[in-house]
């Protein structure tokens, strides 16, 4: 049973429901900190799922054998349980999952936040080796994980948060981070199962974080270009845009865009 956090109207709301998909190491909790309540207060049914092996969602099989298709199935299973097709909103790896989901599923719109680009994570992995060569190599060799990213508050801040996030918050968020194992889903993002933008028809908002060290402005712009739109960047933000001080600017931009793209819910 997947962990699902569900807030906002559950009846005959005229607004399209929103389905939030977290990134690697994270779970549905990262959306519950601010975004779910924000959008629920705007009248949107706001649903966040923890992908298998993340948050409180169990893994039916060892994560080393988990594929990107498994994550897409997780998103589809939650989306199929909603009364209308949801807008899908993905952060980081969750943005990659959303891109793959949209290849075979309809959605009225999609939002990508600091997303893995269609070209995958090769540059990201090279960056980890440059920044922490021995730590990255040791985790890949011994634990078969990407443990050089967020195993400590110090690494979590370096990877995900700006200096403006209080130490206590970074420690709290770091305590909620999961191990991200080198499974099929990681290989899919590296080269085996890259997105096919030509198969995607949903209108898309692509947002980047100005101070993101994981995915460069060039990669964010390439993502937007692949989906025939323009990238927008939130000033002063690090990678975890939904948890940073100033998260309201991100949420408000998404809300303004949704109000023009999805003013009412569409039937299945």
Model-derived features: positions:
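Active-site glycine-rich loops that stabilize anionic/oxyanionic intermediates
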Residues: 23-27, 92, 210
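The serine-hydrolase catalytic nucleophile loop
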Residues: 24-36, 218
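Conserved alpha/beta-hydrolase
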Residues: 38-60
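Active-site loop/oxyanion-hole signature of alpha/beta-hydrolase fold enzymes
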Residues: 56-86
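Flexible "cap/lid" loop of the alpha/beta hydrolase fold
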Residues: 107-143, 185-188
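Short beta-strand/loop motif that positions the catalytic acidic residue
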Residues: 200, 206-208
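Conserved alpha/beta-hydrolase "acid-adjacent" motif
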Residues: 213-219
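Catalytic active-site module of serine/aspartate enzymes centered on a nucleophile-bearing elbow/loop
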Residues: 230-268
């Amino acid at each position: 049973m997947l962990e699902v956090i569900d807030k906002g109207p559950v009846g005959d709301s005229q607004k399209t429901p929103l389905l939030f998909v977290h990134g690697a190491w994270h779970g549905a909790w990262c959306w519950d900190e601010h975004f779910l309540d924000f959008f629920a207060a705007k009248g949107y049914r706001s649903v966040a799922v923890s992908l298998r092996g993340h948050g409180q969602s169990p893994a039916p099989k060892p994560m080393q054998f988990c594929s990107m298709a498994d994550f897409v199935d997780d998103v589809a299973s939650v989306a199929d349980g909603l009364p209308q097709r949801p807008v899908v909103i993905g952060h980081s790896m969750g943005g990659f999952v959303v891109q793959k989901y949209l290849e075979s599923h309809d959605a009225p719109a999609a939002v990508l936040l600091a997303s893995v680009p269609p070209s995958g994570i090769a540059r990201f992995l090279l960056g980890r080796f440059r920044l922490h060569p021995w730590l990255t190599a040791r985790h890949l060799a011994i634990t078969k994980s990407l443990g050089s990213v967020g195993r400590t508050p110090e690494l979590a801040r370096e990877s995900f948060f700006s200096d403006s996030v209080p130490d206590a918050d970074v420690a709290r968020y770091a305590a909620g981070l999961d191990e991200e194992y080198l499974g099929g889903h990681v290989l899919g993002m590296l080269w085996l199962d890259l997105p096919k933008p030509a198969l995607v028809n949903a209108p898309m908002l692509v947002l980047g974080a100005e101070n993101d060290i994981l995915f460069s402005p060039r990669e964010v712009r390439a993502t937007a270009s692949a989906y025939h739109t323009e990238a927008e960047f939130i000033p002063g933000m690090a990678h975890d845009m939904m948890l940073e001080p100033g998260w309201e600017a991100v949420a408000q931009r998404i809300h303004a865009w949704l109000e023009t793209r999805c003013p009412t819910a569409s039937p299945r």
